[in-house]
Every structure is written in structure tokens, then in C-alpha cells.
């Protein structure tokens, strides 16, 4: 009896990992791009499946660990990744189909980036359905990045950036460089995007595109309507910077100001925003936003005497004017062109003026659209902490 128990336990232990897949046999999915099939791709529908309203063209970027090691060694021509593009009407069916298209078992726990094309994001219900799929899948992480592409997502995943082993790795790293540029939106995490969808708040998502030089470019943002959860327009880099200042999300960047026709580069080191609101009657809301910046003159000219306080004060005033121009411009666009509050002013009222907010929230973006009618007064105060490089200008 004892011998039988020992043999049974031994057999159990030795077969405990019968379904294990070796790491070198896995196909790690690190990037996903979602498009609408174009006319040429529609004609190549698989197995007689005609074009449907919800057809997707999905590109999966997979990395092979064994090739990743060899690709890093000198003289190796092995590519550490490969792309597979499939077409279907649901993401779940395409995930199942992916397993039959590669000899390696697809593994999604290391998925870093999901790129949704602007055409897909315009479809009614499409974007929310896609986000819901990724949230519900057990292998997906809520920290993965979500981006919208201006153009085909497939084309972006097919570009191999210089000095990087794979496109997704470059995209994942570059998307986090907000400390270098105020024109980039903060990384749009799946969890936060899904929360905005549930709350039916209008929101922004990082924008990615391809330049004329065929390089990957992360700049600007995609604007989504909170009621329909559909993409409704782009904000360029400067307007995105304006939203970052108002939302207190600027971590760095450069402001180019002019003094006497000469360009001065002001490197931002710290930004602090203060805000308060005043509600008159039941419907008139006024926001007072103070933006304080501190930074360095990174590029100046030798003939400009920066030891004089008057020169520094004039430069600070020019910087104030530039930031005020950027922020007021995006406020005008959001209020007059879109009528959508992606500045999170409604969220501020909900926290700081809850009773009044409950009375006006249904008319904030809809109905009377009180967001568009609210007053937003912005004041900027910039300080030059120290000077940087001096460049001697040409003398006549």
C-alpha cells in the first residue's frame, strides 16, 4: 500500500507540467494594430467571407526569444520579430485563428502596445468593443499602451526604426518621453481608457503617425466623444501642449520665444497649475487657472546681456505670452469646434463643487453645453532660474 502511494505521488509530480510550453516555443505578441480592410484587401476575403460592416484587419507583432538573442549579436541578420495580418469580424475569432497561422503558441501577457487606426475609431461602437475585449482577456495587462494612428496601424508596425530591434519596442519607449516634449500626451493606459469609457467622459489618446521621411512620429492627440465613445478629431502638437498645461501634465519641453527678432529657447524644468472655479447662479461657471513655470534659457545670443534684470523680465513676459497663446487657442477649439471637455474641468467641479455639479452635469457637454459657455481665464507666470548655452551671433 505504501509503495503504491509513493509511486502514485511520484507519477503526479512528474506529470504536473504536462501542458508547459517552453519559452523558446512561445510567440510573444508585443504589438497589435487594428485597421479596416481597404478595397484590395476586401477582395481577398478568406474562405468566401464577404466584407462586413465590422470586418477588421488586425496585425500582430510577435517576438521570438531565441532570435532576439541572435539579433543582438554582431554579424547576425536574424530578425527578432515577425508580423502576421489576419482579417475577421471579431478580435476573439482572430486570436483563435492566429494560433493556426504560426508554429509558436501566441502569448499575450507581454503585449505592450495596441494601435487603433482613426478609421476604426470613427466606427460606431468599434473602439469601445475593442477596449472591452482587451480588458476582459485574462492575459492582457491593464497597463498596456493604447494609441490611435493617423493612417493605417499596419504600416506603422511594418516600419523598422534605426537602432531598435523591433517597431513595438521603439514605440513603447518613445511614447514615454513626455519629459522631453510637452506636445506629447501622457501614455494612454488601457485601464484609464476603459475607465473613461465607463464614465462616458470625453478623453484624449496618444496619436501616432508616419512622417514623409517614413519615420514613426508620436505627437498630438486623438479626441473622443464621451457619449458615443467615437473618435471625432485630432489635436496637433501645440494644442496637445495646451491641454497638458491646463491639466497640469507638463513634465518638460522647450518654449521658443523671440526678443528683438532673436530666438530664445526656454527649457521647462517645472510646471505647477492652480485652479479654482466660481459658479454664478446655477449655470454660469468661471474657471481661474494659474500656470507657473520655472526653467532655463538653453539657447541665447552673446550680444543679449542676460545679466540685466530688464532683459530677463522681458524674456519671462515673452514666455508667458506664448504659453497663454497656446492654452487659450486650445480652449477656443474645444469650446467652439467640439464642445467637448477633455480638460477635465467637469471632473474638477465634481470634486470641489459637488452639489452644483449635480445640477448641471447633464447639460455640461450635452443639452445646453455649459462647458462651451463657461469662462476660462488663464494667467501665466514664468521664471528664468538660470541661463544655459551662449551662442555668438554673426556680426555685420
Where are these regions (language model features)?
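Membrane-proximal alpha-helical signals and transmembrane carboxylates
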Residues: 2-396
Amino acid at each position: 500500500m505504501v509503495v503504491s502511494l509513493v509511486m502514485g505521488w511520484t507519477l503526479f509530480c512528474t506529470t504536473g507540467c504536462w501542458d508547459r510550453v517552453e519559452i523558446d516555443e512561445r510567440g510573444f505578441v508585443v504589438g497589435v494594430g487594428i485597421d479596416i480592410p481597404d478595397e484590395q484587401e476586401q477582395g481577398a476575403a478568406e474562405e468566401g467571407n464577404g466584407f462586413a460592416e465590422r470586418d477588421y484587419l488586425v496585425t500582430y507583432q510577435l517576438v521570438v526569444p531565441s532570435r532576439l538573442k541572435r539579433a543582438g549579436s554582431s554579424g547576425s541578420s536574424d530578425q527578432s520579430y515577425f508580423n502576421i495580418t489576419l482579417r475577421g469580424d471579431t478580435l476573439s475569432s482572430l486570436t483563435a485563428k492566429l494560433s493556426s497561422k504560426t508554429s509558436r503558441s501566441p502569448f499575450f501577457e507581454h503585449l505592450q502596445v495596441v494601435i487603433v487606426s482613426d478609421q476604426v475609431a470613427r466606427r460606431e461602437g468599434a473602439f469601445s468593443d475593442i477596449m472591452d475585449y482587451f480588458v476582459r482577456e485574462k492575459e492582457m495587462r491593464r497597463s498596456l499602451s493604447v494609441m490611435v494612428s493617423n493612417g493605417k496601424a499596419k504600416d506603422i508596425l511594418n516600419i523598422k526604426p534605426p537602432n531598435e530591434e523591433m517597431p513595438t519596442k521603439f514605440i513603447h519607449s518613445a511614447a514615454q518621453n513626455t519629459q522631453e516634449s510637452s506636445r506629447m500626451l501622457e501614455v494612454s493606459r488601457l485601464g484609464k481608457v476603459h475607465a473613461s469609457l465607463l464614465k462616458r467622459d470625453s478623453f484624449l489618446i496618444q496619436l501616432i503617425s508616419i512622417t514623409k521621411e517614413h519615420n514613426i512620429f508620436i505627437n498630438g492627440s486623438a479626441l473622443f466623444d464621451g457619449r458615443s465613445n467615437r473618435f471625432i478629431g485630432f489635436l496637433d502638437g501645440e494644442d496637445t501642449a495646451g491641454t497638458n498645461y491646463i491639466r497640469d501634465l507638463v513634465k518638460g519641453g522647450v518654449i521658443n520665444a523671440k526678443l528683438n527678432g532673436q530666438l530664445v529657447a526656454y527649457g521647462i524644468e517645472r510646471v505647477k497649475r492652480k485652479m479654482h472655479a466660481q459658479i454664478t447662479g446655477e449655470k454660469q461657471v468661471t474657471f481661474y487657472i494659474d500656470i507657473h513655470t520655472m526653467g532655463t534659457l538653453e539657447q541665447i545670443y552673446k550680444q543679449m546681456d542676460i545679466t540685466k534684470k530688464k532683459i530677463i523680465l522681458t524674456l519671462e513676459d515673452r514666455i508667458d505670452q506664448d504659453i497663454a497663446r497656446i492654452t487659450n487657442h486650445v480652449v477656443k477649439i474645444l469650446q467652439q469646434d467640439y464642445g467637448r471637455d477633455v480638460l477635465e474641468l467637469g471632473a474638477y467641479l465634481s470634486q470641489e463643487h459637488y452639489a452644483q455639479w449635480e445640477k448641471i452635469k447633464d447639460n455640461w457637454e450635452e443639452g445646453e453645453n455649459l462647458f462651451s459657455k463657461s469662462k476660462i481665464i488663464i494667467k501665466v507666470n514664468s521664471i528664468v532660474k538660470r541661463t544655459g548655452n551662449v551662442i555668438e551671433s554673426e556680426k555685420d
